Amino acid sequence: MADFDYETFDYSDGLDENGYWSGIKALDYVTLPEDFGSIALKESDLTPTEDELQQQMDSLLNQYTASQPVTGRAAQSGDVANIDYTGTVDGVAFTGGTATGYDLTLGSGTFIDGFEDQIIGHNVGDTFDVTVTFPDGYGDSTDAEGNTITLSGKEAVFSVTLNSLSESVTPELTDEWVESNFGISDGLHTADQLRSYFSDALYANNYDNAIVDYLMANSTFKELPAEITSYYIRMFLNHYNQYATAYSMDLNAFAQTQGYTSADAMLAASDAYFEHLTKQDLIFQAVAEAKSLAPTQEELDDANSTYADTYGENRAHLNALQACVLDWLEENATVA
């Protein structure tokens, strides 16, 4: 982990203005299958199954869940508990350990391990203690006078009052619900129309995946350029370091909350992921090199307006290049 400068990571690092990896000729690293320009796919592999379609519909409905108060029972996993809490370590209150009217989804893992579990089973109006242990590496805090309080590895006691409970209710898929939510914006008026819309979207996604999977399985690679693999390692570490910082942890402490012994162990477990991303980028660039493909200015402008503010122009141009390559591959593929 120490070998990678992840704190200053920039999404456009190592990319040129064309969306290519700077100084890298992809065709020197990957040999594409002879039929890459005429990939044959099976219709049965692209058509979504009923299970896939139902998962999409369920996911959509879950986005429209509404909250309603819970009465007459104790707190359960999945409930949103509105709580007041005050935390102490060795009997001393610490900064960041007190809140009023905080909404906490039980079972979400938002708080320190064990905190949410100890709320489950309590009723609205209860006041009780929750005892947890901060993970090793957890950042220090201060007391009311500004004195440092060490939290790493320390036991903390939180006095918690359960103010209220609420639960999410998922709507049913009906023509009326579709009309109300998608009639004007998307021109969808019935449940059958909505299902057809998602079926088409899944088919298109399966098409994309089938093309990429075929090329990944049938291309041969020499050694992978360290510049690309390092880029994705730095991106990975930067991403999780932001989470760790938000919770006043270092990367090692955060990795432990994810079930790893250290950040290096978390990194090692992701080696195949970094290799996959590197190979995929090489394939897209190799096709672009072999067929002299490039996005239009309009496509570059669209990519810039969507991605450049967050990822920089060069990364936006890589996205546009890969979309251009995928379009070409799909136009030249056959489905039977």
Go through each PLM region and give its residues:
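FKBP-type peptidyl-prolyl cis-trans isomerases
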Residues: 1-336
